[in-house]
Amino acid sequence: MRHISKEWNNGASLIENQFRRLVSLCVLYLAQGLPAGFTYVAFVAYLSDNGTPPEDIAILFATIALPWTFKFVWGPVIDLLVIPEFGRRRPWILFAQSGMVISLATILFVPNIIDKIALVTVLLFIHNLFSSLQDVSVDALAVDVLQPDEVAKANGMMFATKRGGMIIGGAVLGMLVPDFGIKFVIMIQIPLLILIMLLPLFLREKPGNKLFPWENSESEIVKPKEVVLNSEEGTLLAWKENDDLRFRGA
């Protein structure tokens, strides 16, 4: 435990700390897998068990898949609209996670989920819209902060944690539905997603980034074209100019 704490505190930003960047990327992917597993497994099983027509379930599946089909649209958007002083990707990740929480919480106010399946489908579409935005933003963050020799390991770890989140959301939470109800299971996910959101809220991407608007920058923001040495290994960082790093998100 002491070793983990030491690794976490070794360097203030993701660029400076390998342990922080790997853990952060994996936890953010867990946040995507949790509601995805719930939606595609537990929620669909609940609908089927309560007599929802197959055609309504098919429409639900098709609708929530749309944001993922066209998520390539997010790439140019998050590259174009940036607030460098807070990190290039961090504001987008926080925005996406906030949208995921709000859209999921809104379902709690639907009086009868079975009777209002069309409304729930719209809300889950919005939820997946924000989830796909987080997916693209986290992948972009990985490209920015990972070093070339970390990419394969990070990609595998991120894929595994997302699938782990899907197992928790689908199987574990699904087993709670018969005893506690579907809305109780949704309520469990909301604080979990909020807790995960605290991670990027208090982490800097690069030295000099501000966490909040009222905070003074610790130092001048490092420009991407500058060659910077990793304090841990003395190797060039993956976000320097003209890097040939390639990353594929899970």
Regions found by a protein language model. Give the residues of each.
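Glycine-rich segments within core transmembrane alpha-helices of 12-TM secondary carriers
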Residues: 67-71, 152-177
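A membrane-interface helix-boundary motif in multi-pass transporters
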Residues: 86-93, 116, 175-193
